[in-house]
Amino acid sequence: MSKATGFIKEFRDFAVKGNAIDLAVGVIIGAAFGKIVDSLVKDVVMPLVNFILGGSVDFSNKFLVLSMPDGYTGPMTYADLTKAGANVLAWGNFITIIINFVLLAFVIFWMVKAIYFARRKEEAAPEAPAAPPEDVTVLREIRDLLKDKQGS
C-alpha cells in the first residue's frame, strides 16, 4: 500500500468514524443554539432590562476621539469619524459587549440548569419492574403445581 493510499484511508477513517462527525453536529447545533440565545438576550432580556432601568443600556455610541483628520467638519458619530480616518477609542461598544456577554452567560446558565432539572426528574421517576420472562413464569407455575400435589 502506498503512502498516499494509506493517508487517504487514515483520513477517511478519521472523518467518518470517531468523534469528527459528533463534533461537526455539535458545532452546527451550537451555532443554531447561539442564535436562539442571542435573540433571547436581544429581543426579550435587553428590552426588559431597559424598561426596568428606565432607559437604554446601550453604550455603543460612547467613544473618545483621540485624533481628528485635518479639516474634518462632518458629523461626530462613531461611524462617520472612523470612516473619515479619525482615531477613536470605542469604550462604549466594549462596555455594551461585556454587558451582553454577562446577560448571555446568565441566560445560558439558567437554560442548562433547567435541562439538568428536567433530566433529574426523569431519572428520579421509578420504573415499573419488568415482567419476568415467560420461562420463569412457567417454572413458577410448575413449582406451585408440584407444591399443591405434595400438600394434598
Swiss-Prot record:
One of its GO terms (cellular component) is plasma membrane. Its main location: membrane. It is a multi-pass membrane protein. It comes from the Bacteria. InterPro entries: MS_channel, MSC/AndL, MscL_channel. The keyword ATP-binding does not apply. Channel that opens in response to stretch forces in the membrane lipid bilayer. May participate in the regulation of osmotic pressure changes within the cell. Belongs to the MscL family. Homopentamer. HAMAP family: MscL. This is Large-conductance mechanosensitive channel. It comes from Bordetella pertussis (strain Tohama I / ATCC BAA-589 / NCTC 13251). The gene is mscL.
